[in-house]
Regions:
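Tryptophan (W) side chains
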Residues: 3-5
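Short, positively charged and aromatic/hydrophobic N-terminal segments
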Residues: 24, 30-33, 38-42, 46, ...
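Rhodanese-like catalytic fold shared by cysteine-dependent sulfurtransferases
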Residues: 51-59, 63-69, 75-109, 115-173
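ATP-dependent adenylation/nucleotidyltransferase module used to activate substrates
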Residues: 154, 158-328, 332, 340, ...
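Catalytic subdomain that performs nucleotidyl-dependent activation
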Residues: 243, 321-402, 406
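The feature marks non-catalytic terminal segments
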Residues: 374-453
Length: 453
């Protein structure tokens, strides 16, 4: 009798999910194997490799340093927001097998990971079929991050307990992790980050006395840092203003929401969370769902902020966002415009939008994040596993990444290219412009050409 059906992928996956059935089936196969070993041997190898394909965070921690290599399968726009220490970027699908073999030949275990462990498991199973045995990290980067955060919270609790005991004995207290992070803003990153934050507020007149500002937190590094900077500004108490730290849950998956809440707790940011159904609303939209999502999010934030008595919302766009937007407008939109440091809302009377991170460089934000061992998410969309276009401002990742890479390339030739792009919208000479728009009305140079003769 032939047992070729056992090679069916779906059948094997179902067996993997039912251990009792698998044990029974393997016992059955051991009897059949004596009669027909040829067909069974391939199955047994496949079952063995697939049953051992996942590795947990706990198991990963137990591995000796240098005995394994992590391969990050996420794209550049995600890896730029953080990678597991020691990981390298995985090669594309065609080169992945060769990359894995290279590390396996060095006697190392190869561990793949993606955002949640879905794609990495599929890739590991595919490589197993080719006889290349690699592992997939359970839960992916998100699962690793949650496990790490839990560990750090336990360490912080121990520090607090030790400090209580030290206080009673008159011993010196140890700084908590939150205090260390706040200290880094005042000391190490004062010039690169806090001073530029204050400069933007003064230069563009972003904060006035008695303002009540909703600090809009998406969960990424930019908005979380902005929240800490506002707390530091308020600590100086130059004039009175109030803050609300606003988080909108537009339909986050459970893990992403937990990461946001854990980071807020670590950073001592008292967030106010409200829910909406934006993700469900844009789920069926094929064209530009991210753009629509970004527009809808802003509307919800304005509405909730106004309900809470705020007169301003603050967004975490930084210097690099500004210059990329200027260049993208020219290259993809055939227009010259910038991301403004502040705007009056057209739909919510009395409300303003401010961008106090306007002068802060993204590399400095990343340096602050990495120096403090912080980990954030880029897009908390519940479609993160399969969506490759999400970006907080609604622009596709590919376009923004292309523009970012183009600027970096131009900088190799001209080191002033970034500041030149930024200043280009400050030095517009209307006499050298063919046409411009104001309040929706287009004006041509021909309108006044003869009058200027």
């Amino acid at each position: 009798m032939e047992w070729l059906w056992i090679y069916d992928q779906q059948c094997i996956q179902q067996l993997m999910q039912n251990k009792d059935l698998l044990l029974y089936f393997e016992s059955f196969l051991s009897i059949i194997n004596k009669r027909n070993p040829t067909n069974i041997v391939g199955y047994e190898r496949k079952v063995e490799s697939m049953s051992n394909i996942n590795i947990s965070y706990k198991e990963l921690k137990q591995l000796e340093k240098g005995s394994y290599q992590l391969l990050d399968m996420r794209d550049e726009s995600n890896t730029s927001y953080g990678m597991i220490p020691g990981a390298v970027v995985a090669a594309d699908e065609e080169e992945l097998a060769a990359q894995a073999k290279e590390y396996l030949d060095q006697g190392k275990k190869v561990i793949l990971y993606c955002t949640k462990g879905i794609f990495s498991k599929e890739a590991a199973e595919k490589l197993a079929e080719e006889g290349i045995n690699v592992l997939s990290l359970e839960g992916g980067y998100t699962g690793w991050l949650l496990s790490l955060m839990k560990e750090e919270q336990e360490n912080d609790q121990k520090t607090e307990q030790n400090n209580k005991e030290a206080e009673g004995k008159g011993k010196k207290k140890e700084l908590t992790r939150t205090q260390e992070i706040e200290k880094s803003i005042r000391k190490k990153f004062h010039k690169q980050i806090f001073s530029k934050f204050v400069k933007a507020i003064k230069t563009y007149d972003l904060v006035q006395e008695n303002d009540k500002i909703a600090i809009c937190i998406s969960g990424g590094k930019d908005s979380m840092l902005m929240a800490k900077l506002f707390q530091e500004l308020k600590r100086h108490n130059k004039f009175h203003f109030d803050l609300v730290f606003l988080v909108m849950d537009p339909g986050y998956n459970e893990m992403n929401r937990q990461i946001i809440e854990n980071n807020a707790k670590l950073l001592d940011i008292p967030i106010t969370v409200f829910e909406s159904d934006i993700f469900d609303a844009v789920y069926e939209i094929e064209k530009s769902p991210c753009y629509l999502c970004a527009r809808m999010r802003r509307g919800y934030l304005y509405s909730k902020a106004k309900e809470l008595g705020c007169n301003k919302i603050a967004l975490g766009h930084h210097y690099d966002d500004v210059i990329e937007t200027i260049l993208m407008g020219m290259l993809y939109g055939a227009q010259v415009q910038t991301m403004m440091p502040k705007l009056h809302s057209t739909n919510f009377e009395g409300m303003e939008l401010i961008r106090p991170m306007y002068l802060i460089r993204e590399d400095d934000i990343k340096h602050w994040r990495d120096y403090n061992g912080l980990h954030f998410i880029q897009c908390a969309c519940k479609f993160t596993d399969t969506c490759t276009t999400c970006n907080p401002d609604g622009v596709t990742k590919s376009k923004r990444m292309e523009t970012k890479q183009l600027i970096a390339k131009m900088k190799e030739i001209n080191p002033y290219v970034e500041s030149n792009i930024f200043k280009s919208v400050e030095n517009v000479n209307l006499k050298t412009i063919i046409a411009y728009k104001k309040d929706g009305v287009k004006h041509s140079f021909l309108d006044t050409y003869d009058q200027e003769n």
